[in-house]
């Protein structure tokens, strides 16, 4: 089963808890976090996400997809120094394992700019290939592809999320999950948001990387791709 607020409230009463799952598309929050974010029984599920609820309709503290956004917005912001140090430590750890290149699908431009500084300081230990999140797609079109002469940093693509994951019961299926009363969710990136980005990406030659797992989500996305290809002259 998935953890709920009842599993953690007893020892986290004084502090809000936001604990993302390893897949990054679901999280556990405690009662303090629910109160701070203003999430109640009456709060509707957002497009592209859902609040898991008990039989009485109360949020259990397990949140998926875009239902994580209210909690992410109230998290304290990290400093640039903290983020830069984490990037440097990550680069060192990767190099120590013999990795010569990594890919980050969804790295914000804030982190990209910090990586540029690290590169200028001569502290890049391996190549990094970047796709920025779909929320920063317009900035990607504005900046264009950014690539260092030594190939250590290549900012090229745009990362899109359509549904959740099978493990979190968030991937959008045609039928309900065998152990749940729902079939997942779509809309993490709504069609109305995605189509103009697809058209621009096809026109500019920008790579699109799409997270799409469930059969219902895959069918929809392929239709959208087809629509974008047919509407865009190349």
Per-region residue spans from a language model:
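Short, flexible, glycine/charge-rich loop motifs used to bind or transfer phosphoryl groups or to couple energy/partner
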Residues: 7-8, 144-146, 230-231
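Short helix-capping segments at alpha-helix termini
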Residues: 120-125, 148, 228-234
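Conserved helix-loop functional segments at active or binding sites
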Residues: 200, 223-231
């Amino acid at each position: 089963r998935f953890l709920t607020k009842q599993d953690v409230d007893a020892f986290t009463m004084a502090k809000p808890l936001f604990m993302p799952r390893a897949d990054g598309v679901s999280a556990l929050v405690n009662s303090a976090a629910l109160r701070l974010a203003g999430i109640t029984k009456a709060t509707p599920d957002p497009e592209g996400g859902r609040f898991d609820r008990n039989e009485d309709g109360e949020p259990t503290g397990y949140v998926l997809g875009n239902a994580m956004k209210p909690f992410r917005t109230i998290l304290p912001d990290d400093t640039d120094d903290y983020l830069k140090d984490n990037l440097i430590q990550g680069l060192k750890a990767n190099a120590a394992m013999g990795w010569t290149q990594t890919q980050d699908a969804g790295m914000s431009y804030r982190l990209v700019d910090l990586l540029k500084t690290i590169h200028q300081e001569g502290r890049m230990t391996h190549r990094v290939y970047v796709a920025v999140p779909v929320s920063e797609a317009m900035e990607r079109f504005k900046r264009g592809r950014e690539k260092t002469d030594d190939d250590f940093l290549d900012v090229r693509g745009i990362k899109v999320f359509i549904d959740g994951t099978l493990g979190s019961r968030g991937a959008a299926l045609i039928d309900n999950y065998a152990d749940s009363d729902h079939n997942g969710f779509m809309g993490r990136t709504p069609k109305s948001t995605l189509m103009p980005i697809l058209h621009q990406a096809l026109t500019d030659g920008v790579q699109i990387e799409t997270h799409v797992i469930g059969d219902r989500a895959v069918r929809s996305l392929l239709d959208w791709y087809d629509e974008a290809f047919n509407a865009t002259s190349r």
